[in-house]
Amino acid sequence: KAVRFIPMFTLEEIEQYTIQNKKNFGTLKEAIYSRKIIDKNHLYSDTILGKKIWDNLLGDTPSKTNIYFSPEGIFHLLGIEYLCFDRPDCKIFRLSSTRRLCEDRGTASKPSLLLLGGLNYNDDSAVIQHPDTLPDRSASEILGRDMLPPVVGQGYTYLNGSLAEVNKIRTLISPNSCQLYQYSKGTEDIVKQDMQKYNMIHISTHGFCFDYQIVPSTLYLKDNVSEDLSLSRCGIILSGANRTAKQDANNKYVEDGILTARELCNLNLTHVELAVLSACQTGLGRITADGIAGLPRGLKKAGANAILVSLWDVNDHATQLLMTQFYRNLLKGKNKIESLHDAQTYVRNYEIEVETGVGKQQWKSRVRQEIDKTKEKSASPQTTKIKKYQDPYYWAAFFLIDAI
């Protein structure tokens, strides 16, 4: 069929779009860059925004159609596939490039999974010295200059939900097909080495991105080191990093425990069918004419196929629920998009029981009432079930790229 051009809006129009909510009025761009939970909830609940983006595109689309899109500009930082619009019958696939549709995707191999989680960032007992070479410590040098953790300050704290997450995922796959690293064992040396051995990678830890502005293409082309610096300001934290990242003479011959997007570029991940970075901000990066310069680009340059990353600081327990259900669906035979969609639905409907208050006081008995009217017995507390994670902040942070 002939290619069809559909005009939508200018960059300024969409960036300055006013988010619909009952109290505060902010723009789309402000909501995307905001770290407030309420702003994420308003953004992804705005039905007018969803229609503005999707209605013209999907108006003449047949039912149950697969939609493939490659984002541009600010849409790299917005999960437009999760916005409210009237075509739930369509499956939407985010691609790093539409040329992926023309590539031979081969056949899926038997799952082999590398799992990392429950890492101890203060324990560097398993870190290996490299006296004959100088390890790559560029990440700690850059973060040190910027006065950022874990080089400066208190460092990163232990994630209880991360340990539960990887332990539950481990039970879903054959022990012979899974390698789990916890506590002090998930060092940068081990991760770089073993990421190149498995076709599925799941890393549950802290993530960071300190550079996710949109750069005009004219400026970006003039700066040859812009991409390299951007890739060095996005990464994940591994075992012992609170100690090994310090600018100390004792750390001269050890990896700094910070795996950046730039370092990922140098690995061979062509065999990796799915890479999951279950951490905060792993889908962010500097936006340029070439796309997003962050962890997604590092993984794609290394050759990884589908990746699952996040747009903001995620909730520990909600992420644990999401990831566990995602793998449960995936290992039952569902495709990646269906597995994530069903996992998000599971999180949205996840219920907990909460106490609503103490019931009215009741007399123990009529006889007792006559004997001592001052003694009372409290009724059992009343409880109700609530959907704790139904807001978009809890389930819409993670998105798949190239899950085809």
Residue ranges and their predicted role:
Residues K1-I404:
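Catalytic cores of enzymes
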